[in-house]
Amino acid sequence: MEELKLNTIEEAIADFREGKFVIVVDDEDRENEGDLIVAAEKITPEQVNFMLKHARGVLCAPITISRCKELELPHQVDTNTSVLGTPFTVTVDKLEGCSTGVSIHDRAATIRALADPTSTPETFGRPGHVNPLYAQDKGVLRRAGHTEACIDMARLAGLYPAAALMEIMSEDGTMARLPELRKMADEWGLKLISIRDLIAYRLKQESLVEKGVEVDMPTEYGHFRLIPFRQKSNGLEHIAIIKGDIKEGEPVLVRVHSSCATGDIFGSMRCDCGEQLHKALQMIEKEGKGAVVYLNQEGRGIGLMEKMKAYKLQENGVDTVEANILLGHQADERDYGVGAQILRSIGVTQMRLLTNNPVKRVGLESYGLSIVENVPIEITPNKYNERYLKTKKDRMGHTLHFNK
């Protein structure tokens, strides 16, 4: 990416503030696509026309979750099964001053109205021709997507947190990717940035966690150091368990482990969580250096109460993924941004990651951390967790090799 001469985030913010387009590209391990984005409050009919003529994707309008609630815009579907969980709301058109909602004038007016604090639910007709999107709170530090990048750019520019975006297609109808996006940006006179760089910019500007006091912690697996961290946004407390002297830039063995009270504490055989945690500590002790980041994200981020509801559904025949979806959650709602900042805080920027989960790798790499090796951490299945592990392999892409 460096060879393609991406623009700086500061340059892009300045243009975005003036109402100019910016091209944003995401990670190769995600969509690896470029989106044309512009501030919602600044958009003109001519810009809508440019997007339709040159980008040719789907016209969307990212707004905050709180704004969606204010405007009474529910999710487009109750169960989101799209590949990346794209959070569409019902489609809308601005009613007053518009006709069918299709014209460039009408669509620009609708997008501007989404960014108008005086707009109410009655401002819009449903369905319409603009696709609002729910943007996750905390922006790209929560979800490394174009939707969140739009909201972050608006906030960094001092504008209302709403934008318009459209995916950029090549002439042959395939998705435009680097280096073609660089050529397009040069041809159109636009700034080109990456979500990875936007994440790095925010991580330098903001602190997500408060670091606690470090203590020694002898365990049955070896002697470690423990540092607690408090997440500023919600008060959740996380833990870093460290072995040895970690030097910045040195690839060390790392396990990012989400809390599982049933498995980690009570030894539940319905999952492999506790065994993975204990095995990770043993491996790090044997290595003589490394860290476990223990995140307070029970049930893949849905909490203990919801996890128990999911367990009950599983007892009635659904699998772990279906259970989450039936309860209105995504299959995996974990936030790796806070884990990435904890790792940076203890000096880890390169790691040999203990995981079977490809999403975890992508999640951490999206925050500028380098994973030099994936180290498997497989557990022998038992009769209680056999189906759970098979679901993780078949439906969540986990790298598991048991034959059950």
Swiss-Prot record:
GO terms for cellular component: cytosol. Pathway: Cofactor biosynthesis; riboflavin biosynthesis; 2-hydroxy-3-oxobutyl phosphate from D-ribulose 5-phosphate: step 1/1; Cofactor biosynthesis; riboflavin biosynthesis; 5-amino-6-(D-ribitylamino)uracil from GTP: step 1/4. It comes from the Bacteria. Residues 205-404 are annotated as: GTP cyclohydrolase II. Its EC number is 4.1.99.12, 3.5.4.25. Catalyzes the conversion of D-ribulose 5-phosphate to formate and 3,4-dihydroxy-2-butanone 4-phosphate. HAMAP family: RibA, RibB, RibBA. This is Riboflavin biosynthesis protein RibBA. It comes from Phocaeicola vulgatus (strain ATCC 8482 / DSM 1447 / JCM 5826 / CCUG 4940 / NBRC 14291 / NCTC 11154).
